[in-house]
């Protein structure tokens, strides 16, 4: 294990050196080391390097800002912090306050800075930790909805649903006509994760659901598992799967298979962001439309919104006012109208900032939800994805129902543990898994 740890340290050191040389600033490592104002920014995916980095460099051509491709969760940054290498600015997408607790002592609190006043209150309701600090800020929302083949609906005389009852009826009519109602890549953890939150979206947006979520995001210790709430959530998830006519066959459906079924007109609905819908529209000889996710306990409908990224500052920045000002300049670029448009790749942006309008002109069909602020912010605790996959596959395979999910020591409590606990055993296991992938790839 000691040898493996040394291998990983060496590997990460090599990545840092390479990233320094290949960063947007185009400076060598030697040149960077001489500049105390050098700012390191880790972006969670490569597309951000292509979309937002040139814009930021254009605004600040004389500043020494280095952009590096990082990771989609906080584990990498916890490792960097342990070895004294925490970047100045970090971004992730899969995130919850609980995930980032190891980093809390090392991250800056935004609550005392003006930038917080530029956010809608609902956008930050899940971003306070147990000390009422706001160490992370979301940057622009991507609206995830159902994408429906309107032409196919009309061909069979089926109306586009406006509530959950109509959704279930439409699915049954499509099924009776030999059309798969909803093509979904349920072999993927993110789609199983979505099914639980959107199938029971009314529960997550209820007072009980909001209270549970707020407690989950901010608690410093274990979270009390709300049995009554989660029994309803599992029950509505199961109902959604059945009403959508998903079966055990869908357990193995990957993203390519699900996409192809929709593109070929064999399925009436898929899911995705505006950019994906536009891409589909260009490929299909059919009119597409968007359908929000419906509550099963009311006539309300909601957009499932995912922040494009979540951003945090290294606390050490507060010791250097010039670097801190530069870091805020970078953040300002990101939350500006131009920056949000670039981050979202030009289509469909739900602005979380009061001084930047929503950019949904090219995304019709969601006006009511936008005007009513009916937006659900996706819960993205890292380990909740695996728990969701196990739960949905258990329901589809018939190995368990919602009652068994609650009773068994596995899934019901697994959700609580996987959502909220990072045990030393799991940490060790994920480290070994990551290391094995690195070594395999290297060899």
Label each residue range with its predicted role.
Residues 93-144, 159, 195, 291:
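Hinge/lid segment of periplasmic solute-binding proteins
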Residues 109-121, 125, 203-232, 282-283, ...:
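Short, solvent-exposed loop/beta-turn-alpha elements that line the ligand-binding surface or hinge
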Residues 47-48, 66, 305, 344-418, ...:
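C-terminal capping/gating helix-and-loop segments adjacent to ligand/active sites or protein-protein/ligand interfaces
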Residues 135, 168-219:
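Extracytoplasmic/periplasmic solute-binding protein
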Residues 173, 215-250:
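Glycine-centered hinge/linker elements that transmit conformational signals in sensory
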Residues 58-59, 156, 281-345:
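Extracytoplasmic/periplasmic substrate-recognition and gating elements
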Residues 9-10, 18-97, 160, 342, ...:
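Conserved N-terminal structural module of periplasmic/extracytoplasmic solute-binding proteins
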Residues 88, 116-151, 180-181, 186, ...:
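A structural signal for short loop-to-beta-strand junctions that line the ligand-binding cleft
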